[in-house]
Regions:
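Long, well-ordered core segments of solenoidal/helical folds
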Residues: 2-17, 34-54
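Short, structured coil/loop segments at alpha-helix boundaries
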Residues: 1-4, 19, 136, 141
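Alpha-helix C-terminal capping/termination sites
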Residues: 1, 29-32, 123
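Non-catalytic C-terminal accessory modules of carbohydrate-active enzymes
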Residues: 40-149
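Solvent-exposed loop and edge beta-strand segments that line ligand/cofactor-binding
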Residues: 7-24, 70-80
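Well-ordered alpha-helical segments within folded domains of soluble proteins
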Residues: 19-31, 81-90
Length: 149
């Protein structure tokens, strides 16, 4: 772990100096090393290299590049730029479906987040994770899961 610490710190410092396509792998690497606060900060970073820039430029879908003018022939509706979706669902909300049909909840919602709510429909069930008043709740089809979080 001590050998990888400088690499993780370097990645956190550099942020999204990579293209949009590699952003998923950067977010995933940070999450798998327990750096959920960094993942959250990168998701909401306000630089020219982030999804906030796409919103600033009027995006209603994800761009191929971080901004319209950053690539001469950029697509303004590109699937690889949707990296936040699985990262938010799996790493922040912690919704993990098993191949057998079960679900484990392992949320990693940063302390700085006062309110969080996500609900997603998969496998004919609705999975919900909410953080409010400092407490995290998970539910399947509206039934609270008893696991302490």
């Amino acid at each position: 772990e001590t050998e990888e610490a400088p690499v993780i710190e370097f990645l956190e410092k550099r942020g999204f100096s990579c293209g949009v396509m590699l952003s998923y792998y950067l977010l995933l690497a940070l999450a798998r090393r327990g750096r959920y606060e960094s993942v959250y900060r990168l998701l909401l970073n306000d630089s020219d290299h982030g999804w906030c820039n796409m919103l600033r430029e009027g995006a209603t879908t994800c761009f191929e590049a971080w901004g319209k003018d950053q690539k001469w022939n950029t697509s303004l509706c590109h699937p690889w730029a949707s990296a936040p979706v699985p990262v938010i669902l799996e790493e922040i909300a912690g919704i993990h479906l098993s191949p057998e049909g079960g679900c484990d909840f392992a949320p990693h919602i940063p302390k700085e987040v006062d309110y969080f709510h996500t609900s997603v429909r998969m496998r004919r069930k609705t999975y919900t994770v909410t953080k409010q008043d400092g407490k995290i709740h998970a539910a399947i089809d509206g039934i609270e899961q008893s696991k302490e979080m």
